[in-house]
Every structure is written in structure tokens, then in C-alpha cells.
């Protein structure tokens, strides 16, 4: 009985000394931390043996000194108490909850502070009190679980194990942990996003307001530009002597004079009508009258009062308009560039036309290429008495529309251009006038062709007339082919009409030149027609001209 009391007292002391004892050290060696746990284990074994019905003699002093083999067998029969692994933060910042090592023989919490697991060897047991990763790291935001894990006590009769409430100072069991910096971090992100959005909105609004503010003065300035231009032109043109000019140049009431009608502001400050051809007075770019830095506006008197703005004349420098927008000067410079390019194009066309014209020289023994020639040009036929198209009644249509070449537009009116070798107006007789002439005119033309050569001193010779008629007949008949007419000879009635214009009588010129030899005309046999004008195209190498060539491609007669 005294032995039982002694054992009970020792067991109570051991259970009381458990919670109040010091923290276990970090020593994980196989040696027990002190003699008290071994003594308690020995006492538990003895208590179990006594409860099993052992004799009282086994409680002697020799019974406490058992062999090691018998101690190991008793320990194998009674498993050690389960150990609790406390919750911790691993190397990834994740919180691992508390777990209890109570499965099989895995009764001890082993491993490291950042990686814990259950094991069955006591010597591998981890001293959890020496670890410091129980609080949230600064860089981790994962909150711990709201409720701490519940740890069970050890075996029967065991005290509170490590990890239970009160085992660590400021125990974490049951404590609700909050994520460190969760509130401030989230609010900071929202604040930053709000500030950026507000700054963007303010910038866009400021840009829109600045653009509107800058656009309004520009529009006002553009509206005032025509008025300033009109004022400048009015002052440079001198005092307005004509009332209509004063009325047209004034944009405010009261400037036209007492006797003028009440002026009003025009609907359009610019002239919407096309200026007349009289305003297009251009000068050659190379001439001293046309300089790139001088604006010279010269206009004829206006045909109607509606062209007031186009009739303002001034001969001033560009520097007087320097305060105006650059669009005026740019427009004038572009016009100058266009005129220069047109002048170069005209020179090129004139050179090509001159070269082609020189290549069209007639070979010997052929008929002339042109239907008419100017008086005195020669060419194998005596045409001294020919008249112009106006005298022959074959003049072109009245008022022909002519597109003037670039040399005419840009050339100086006071001197002839170096490229002025275009065909005269008398040469520009269309083919239709030749083909549509009357049969009477054709007959007179053939009679004129077969007449003897004219001479102011010698009368006509019948022998010469017969030889000329025979030569023309042979030419028209041709070698073994259809009769072909002459090409390029003077048209019908040229000599008779010209002589009538000069002397006032319709008789042929060779009769008057010969001194009135009427017998020769009576004895001359009538001419038999050998061909028509429609057969001109059958003459080899001589075709009807499809168009009249001029000195420039830009000059066209309609």
C-alpha cells in the first residue's frame, strides 16, 4: 500500500510538472532531454503491470531494475503518444494548417521549420519551439485559416502535448488571423487607378479647349483677310476717281460719296464670274516685264459693273502683301511654274515640227505636196498672179476658233518670237473647200493649167500650148493605168478671179498680157477631162493630206 501511494504521488507530480516545465530544446539527438520522461514511462509500465494482477512482490526494489530487453518489449506493446505539428508558413508563403501525427507508428513531428511531416523515429523529432515562421511574412499575402487546428492529448493519462493552447507564448490556436496589408494594398491600387483616369480626363479636356480657343481666332483672321486685301488694293491703286470703283471697293456704308447709292456688303467677296480674255495678258518669263518677284495685274476697262473685283489694277511688289496668309504668294508661284513648264513644252513641239517640216522636201520629178502656195513662192509653176483665199471665195469659215500656242501666250507683243515661223493664214485652206468648189471653177482651173506660159512681153504661142497640153495628157493617162488627175496644182478659177480683182474685167490674164490676142483663144481646142479630183489618191506617193500641219501641236483651227 505505501508503494501504491508513492506511485500515485509521483504520477501527480509528473502531470503537474509537464505544463510548467521549460520549453524543449532544439537538440534532436537520440539522448533524452532529461531523466524525468524516462522515469514517468517506467512508472506507467509498472502501473499497468500492477493493474494486471501481478503479485505484490513484484513491487520490490529489484523489480524496478529490469533488463533492457524487457523494457523494449513493453514499449512495443504500448505505442508512444501522438505529437501535434503546429501550423506554419512554408517557403512559398503558403500557410500549412496544424495536423496531428496519430497514424500507426508515425507519432512524431519531424522535418524542418518550413517543411514538416510525421515520422516514427523519436531521434528525428523536430523542436518546433525554435522555429519562427509562425507569423505572416512581409511578402506573403495568404491569410491563415480562421480557426486553429485542434490538438489531441497523448495517450491515456498524458498531459497537454506541445502545440496546444498555452504551449507557445501568444498561442495561435483559435486566433483569427488577418492578411497583412490586405486593406491598404487593395485601396492603394484603386487610388492609383483613379488618379491616372482623372489625369487622362483632364488632359483630354484641356486639349479640346485649347483647340477650340485656337480655331476661333484663325477663322476670324481668315474672314478679315479679303477685307484687308481690298483695302490694300484700294490704297495702292490711288484715289478712286470713278464712283463705281469707290462703291465696289467699299465694304462699309458711307464711303461711296454723297451722290452714290447706298453701298452694301456683297454676298461673296470674290468674283464668281470667269474673267474675260482681256484680263489674260501674259508676258514671256524671260522678258524683263515678267519677273518672279513682281505682281503685275493689267486689265482692260470692265464691260459691266459686275466685274469690279477683277478690274482692280496694281503694279506693286510682293512685299506689300507679306502680312497676308501665304496662300496668295503660293498661288502666284504655282502659276509661274505652270507657265514655265508650258513654255518648255511649246519649245519642244516647235523644234519637232521644224525638223519634220524640213524632212518633207519634194524629190525631183514629183508634184507639189501643198494645194496652194503664197504668191511669189515659185516651186516650178508661175503663180505670180494668184490671189489669196479671200479673193478666190475659198476663205475659211468666218471667225475661226483658234487655240493659241504657248509662244503666243507667253511671247512679248512688242517683238516677234524666235520660233515664229507658223504657216500664214492664207495657207490654212481646208480640203473641203477645194473638193466642194463648183464645176465651173474646176473647168476654168484646167483651162488655166493648159494655157501657155504667161509673159508680159510675148504673146501666147500655139506650139507651146500644144506641147503643154500633150504633156499634161500623158501625165493624166499614166503608163497602162486609169487616168489620174493632177495633184497640188492651183484650184479652179484662181487666175481669172485674181485678174478680175486687179483689172476689173473677167477676161483671162494671158489675153490682157499679150495685148488682146482673141484669135488664139478662139482657135484653142476644148480640153477633154482625163481624170477627176477623187482619183488623186491613186497617184503613187501623193495622197490627199488628212490634216494640215502647223508649227505647234497647241494651235488648232476649227
From Swiss-Prot:
Expression sites by tissue: Mainly expressed in neurons. Highly expressed in brain structures including cortex, striatum, olfactory bulb, amygdala hippocampus CA1-3 and dentate gyrus (at protein level).
GO-annotated molecular function: GABA receptor binding; ionotropic glutamate receptor binding
Mutant lacking the gene: phenotype: Knockout mice show a decrease in miniature inhibitory postsynaptic currents frequency, but not amplitude, in CA1 pyramidal neurons. Mice show impaired acquisition of contextual fear memory without affecting auditory fear learning or anxiety. Decreased long-term potentiation of hippocampal glutamatergic synapses.
Residue intervals on the Extracellular side: 23-189
Transmembrane regions listed in the UniProt entry: 190-210
Stretch forming the signal peptide: 1-22
Region (Disordered): 53-79, 142-181, 236-263, 443-506
Gene Ontology CC: asymmetric, glutamatergic, excitatory synapse; glutamatergic synapse; postsynaptic density; postsynaptic density membrane; postsynaptic specialization membrane
Biased composition (Pro residues): 453-462
List of residues that carry Phosphoserine: 438
Localization per record: Postsynaptic density membrane
Pfam families: Shisa_N
Entry keywords, A to Z: Cell membrane, Glycoprotein, Membrane, Phosphoprotein, Postsynaptic cell membrane, Signal, Synapse, Transmembrane, Transmembrane helix
Membrane topology: Single-pass type I membrane protein
UniProt motif (PDZ-binding) ranges: 555-558
Residues listed as glycosylation sites in the UniProt record: 26
Biased composition (Gly residues): 148-181
Composition bias type Low complexity, residue spans: 57-77, 466-477
Post-translational changes noted in the entry: N-glycosylated.
Modified residues (Phosphothreonine): 532
Topological domains, Cytoplasmic: 211-558
Stretch list, region GRID: 154-175
Function: Transmembrane protein that regulates gamma-aminobutyric acid type A receptor (GABA(A)R) trafficking, channel deactivation kinetics and pharmacology, necessary for fast inhibitory transmission in the brain. Enhances the action of benzodiazepine, a primary GABA(A)Rs target drug, in the brain. May affect channel kinetics of AMPA-type glutamate receptors (AMPAR), the brain's main excitatory neurotransmitter, necessary for synaptic hippocampal plasticity, and memory recall. May regulate the induction and maintenance of long-term potentiation at Schaffer collaterals/CA3-CA1 excitatory synapses.
Subunit-structure text: Interacts with GABA(A)R (GABA type A receptor) subunits GABRA1, GABRA2 and GABRG2; the interaction is direct. Does not interact with GABRB2 and GABRB3 subunits. Interacts with AMPAR subunits GRIA1, GRIA2 and GRIA3 and AMPAR auxiliary proteins SHISA6 and SHISA7 in heterologous cells. Interacts (via PDZ-binding motif) with DLG4/PSD-95 (via PDZ domain)in heterologous cells; the interaction is direct.
Name of the protein in its database record: Protein shisa-7
Organism annotation: Mus musculus (Mouse)
Amino acid at each position: 500500500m505505501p508503494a501504491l501511494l508513492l506511485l500515485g504521488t509521483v504520477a501527480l507530480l509528473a502531470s503537474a510538472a509537464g505544463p510548467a516545465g521549460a520549453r524543449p530544446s532544439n537538440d534532436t539527438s537520440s539522448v533524452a532531454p532529461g531523466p524525468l520522461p524516462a522515469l514517468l514511462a517506467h512508472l506507467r509500465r509498472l502501473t499497468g503491470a500492477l493493474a494486471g494482477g501481478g503479485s505484490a512482490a513484484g513491487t520490490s526494489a529489484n523489480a524496478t531494475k529490469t533488463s533492457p530487453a524487457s523494457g523494449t518489449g513493453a514499449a512495443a506493446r504500448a505505442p508512444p503518444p501522438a505529437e501535434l505539428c503546429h501550423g506554419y508558413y512554408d517557403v512559398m508563403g503558403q500557410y500549412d494548417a496544424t495536423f496531428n501525427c496519430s497514424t500507426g507508428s508515425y507519432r512524431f513531428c519531424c522535418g524542418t521549420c518550413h517543411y514538416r511531416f510525421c515520422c516514427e523515429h523519436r531521434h528525428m523529432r523536430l523542436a518546433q519551439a525554435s522555429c519562427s515562421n509562425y507569423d505572416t511574412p512581409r511578402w506573403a499575402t495568404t491569410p491563415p485559416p480562421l480557426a486553429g487546428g485542434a490538438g489531441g492529448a497523448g495517450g491515456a493519462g498524458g498531459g497537454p502535448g506541445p502545440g496546444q493552447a498555452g504551449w507557445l507564448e501568444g498561442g495561435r490556436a483559435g486566433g483569427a488571423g488577418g492578411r497583412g496589408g490586405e486593406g491598404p494594398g487593395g485601396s492603394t491600387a484603386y487610388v492609383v487607378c483613379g488618379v491616372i483616369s482623372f489625369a487622362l480626363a483632364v488632359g483630354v479636356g484641356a486639349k479640346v479647349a485649347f483647340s477650340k480657343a485656337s480655331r476661333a481666332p484663325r477663322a476670324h483672321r481668315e474672314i478679315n483677310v479679303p477685307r484687308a486685301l481690298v483695302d490694300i488694293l484700294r490704297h495702292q491703286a490711288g484715289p478712286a476717281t470713278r464712283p463705281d470703283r469707290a462703291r465696289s471697293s467699299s465694304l462699309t456704308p458711307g464711303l461711296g460719296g454723297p451722290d452714290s447709292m447706298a453701298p452694301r456688303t456683297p454676298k461673296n467677296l470674290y468674283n464668281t464670274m470667269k474673267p474675260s480674255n482681256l484680263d489674260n495678258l501674259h508676258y514671256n518669263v524671260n522678258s524683263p516685264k515678267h519677273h518672279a518677284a513682281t505682281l503685275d495685274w493689267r486689265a482692260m476697262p470692265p464691260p459691266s459693273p459686275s466685274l469690279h473685283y477683277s478690274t482692280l489694277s496694281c503694279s506693286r511688289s510682293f512685299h506689300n502683301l507679306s502680312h497676308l496668309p501665304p496662300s496668295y504668294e503660293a498661288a502666284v508661284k504655282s502659276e509661274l511654274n505652270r507657265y514655265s513648264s508650258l513654255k518648255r513644252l511649246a519649245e519642244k513641239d516647235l523644234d519637232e515640227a521644224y525638223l519634220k517640216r524640213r524632212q518633207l522636201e519634194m524629190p525631183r520629178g514629183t508634184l507639189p505636196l501643198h494645194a496652194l502656195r503664197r504668191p511669189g513662192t515659185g516651186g516650178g509653176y508661175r503663180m505670180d498672179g494668184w490671189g489669196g483665199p479671200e479673193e478666190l471665195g475659198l476663205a475659211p469659215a468666218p471667225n475661226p476658233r483658234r487655240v493659241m500656242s504657248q509662244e503666243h501666250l507667253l511671247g512679248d507683243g512688242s517683238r516677234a518670237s524666235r520660233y515664229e515661223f507658223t504657216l500664214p493664214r492664207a495657207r490654212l485652206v481646208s480640203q473641203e473647200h477645194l473638193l466642194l468648189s463648183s464645176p465651173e471653177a474646176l473647168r476654168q482651173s484646167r483651162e488655166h493649167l493648159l494655157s501657155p506660159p504667161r509673159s508680159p512681153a510675148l504673146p501666147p504661142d500655139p506650139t507651146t500650148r500644144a506641147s503643154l497640153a500633150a504633156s499634161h495628157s500623158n501625165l493624166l493617162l499614166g503608163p497602162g493605168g486609169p487616168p489620174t488627175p493632177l495633184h497640188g496644182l492651183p484650184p479652179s478659177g484662181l487666175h481669172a478671179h485674181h485678174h478680175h480683182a486687179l483689172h476689173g474685167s473677167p477676161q483671162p490674164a494671158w489675153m490682157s498680157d499679150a495685148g488682146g490676142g482673141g484669135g488664139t483663144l478662139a482657135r484653142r481646142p476644148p480640153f477633154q477631162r482625163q481624170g477627176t479630183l477623187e482619183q488623186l489618191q491613186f497617184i503613187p506617193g501623193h495622197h490627199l493630206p488628212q490634216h494640215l500641219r502647223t508649227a505647234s501641236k497647241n494651235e488648232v483651227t476649227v
